[in-house]
Structure formats: C-alpha cells, structure tokens
Amino acid sequence: MNFIGKILGFIIGYRFGGLFGGIAGLILGHIADKKLYELGSVNSSFFSKKITRQSLFMQTTFAVLGHLSKAKGRVTEEDIQLANNLMSQMQLDVANRQLAQNAFNRGKEADFPVREVIREFRIGCGQRADLLRMFLHIQVQAAFADSNLHNNEKELLFVIAEELGLSRFQFDQMLAMEMAARQFTQGGFYRQQQYQQQSHQQYNQENYQNSYRTSSGPTVEDAYKVLGVNAGDNQQTVKRAYRRLMNEHHPDKLVAKGLPKEMMEMAKEKAQQIQAAYDLICKVKGWK
C-alpha cells in the first residue's frame, strides 16, 4: 500500500489547520495515493480491468508458460512441477501463487489468445526493451528446461518474440545467446536449487566464476554468443556489448521498471551469465 500522500497530507494539514486541517489533508493524501497507484497500474482485458505492472508481468509469465507447455501436444507432470517449482523459488505468497496457478491453467486452454495477451503485456510494460527481453528470456529458459527444444515450442517462442517487436534474425540471435548462456549456469534457473539459498545476497566475481562450472565447461565460443560478439572483435567492442547487456539486465533497474521482485533471482542469474562470459573472454584474450 502507498501511504506517502496520507502522511504528508496529514502533516501539512495539521501544521496549517490543526486537527481539522490534518483530517482534510489525510483525505486529500488518500486521493493522491490512489491516483499515484493508478498511474502505476495498467488495463488488462484478459486478467482484470486494473492490474499493477508487477502483477501483469507475473501472470503473463505463467499464462504463457502454460501455453508453451501445451505446445508440445500435452502438458506433462514435469511441466506442472516446473511451474510449481518456479512459484516456490519465487516465494510467492498464497494470493499470488493462486493467481499464478490460474494464469498457468488459462494458458493451457486451446483458445488462449497468445498474441493479444502479449500485445497487452508489451503496452503494459511501456514497451521497455529490457523488461520485454527478460520476459522472453524466462520463456526460453522454460522451453529448454528439459534440454530439448520442440519445434512447436520454437515456433511459439518466435510468435512471442514477434509480438514483443523482435525480427526473425533478432530472435535467432537471442536463441543462440540463450543456448550458449546455459553453459554458464548448469542448465539455467529452473535447475538451480542453490539460488534459493542465495536469495537477496550480493553476488561477486567469485560467485560468477563458480556458477558456470559444468562437466564439460563453457567454451570461449559460448562466451562470444552470450555477449553477441564475434571472435575477431576488439576489446572496446566486447566491453561495450558487455556493459550494454549488464545495464539491460541489472536486477534493481528491472524491478524498478516493473519486474516482480520475486523474479529478481532470474535477473541475477542472467547477469551472472553475462559476467562469466565476459570474464572468460578476457582470460582467453589476456585482457585486463
């Protein structure tokens, strides 16, 4: 809840008008708080008439996850468990967990209007590219959770990407980046139980280095794909790409723009992948 308007209204009203002035200020402050809340909310014809951006992001995420699960032909127990695990990892309260479950179930329906839902989501997010890419990142991670990307899943992911404003080339490039990034976190957020223990902790370079160790280990070619650069690019070009991606996936900035705080660990994981890829390139190239 927002109380700033009420508090300021009462203080100012009381100072200039005593008790009655304070009460009047409290009422005006309440109206101001309500207006400010509405400015931070959006319309949604699918979920509810008025919804916060954070709730829109969360519910759209699970609705599309449900639709993505159905794209393979049928929703398996593993798909349902994956969604439930994600809800647990996000530490959703009872009310939000129910919203997420309802959204997932609605997404499984044959007549789920995926394009319409994504269009509303894009508008609701203010068409912020970083938020939209984070949303797509989550969906791609889910599709790869079983280490196998079904053709129908890939085509649905492109439909989502297209509605978010990406071209086929941009989508294919992002898919390659995401596939390479998985090498730096042993399969992605959905298979990383340790992130539950690391919630809300400050990560550092040691965490980055430890987080991407796999049985085979990521290659420098994977690192180039994660940053979207070429092997022949100079240090300035690579650093520019690294800084741009880190800025786009900064957890605190994403939350401030509308990413639910419960999804901050996903943003942290993406930042870890980017950092680990950059560190590996610098090590191989001998860059300081």
Swiss-Prot record:
Q: What's the domain remark here?
A: The transmembrane domain is a dimerization domain.
What name is this protein filed under?
Co-chaperone protein DjlA
Assembly notes:
Homodimer.
Question: Which InterPro entries does the UniProt record give?
Answer: DjlA (IPR023749), DjlA_DnaK_co-chaperone (IPR050817), DjlA_N (IPR007791), DnaJ_domain (IPR001623), J_dom_sf (IPR036869), TerB-like (IPR029024)
Localization in the cell: Cell inner membrane
Q: Which Gene3D superfamilies match?
A: DnaJ domain, TerB-like
Q: How does it sit in the membrane?
A: Single-pass type III membrane protein
Instruction: Tell me which residues make up the J domain.
Output: 222-288
Species per Swiss-Prot/TrEMBL record:
Mannheimia succiniciproducens (strain KCTC 0769BP / MBEL55E)
GO molecular function terms attached to this record: protein-folding chaperone binding
Gene that encodes the chain: djlA
| Entry keyword set | Cell inner membrane, Cell membrane, Chaperone, Membrane, Transmembrane, Transmembrane helix
Q: Name one GO cellular component term.
A: plasma membrane
Q: Which residues lie on this side of the membrane: Periplasmic?
A: 1-6
| Protein origin, superkingdom | Bacteria
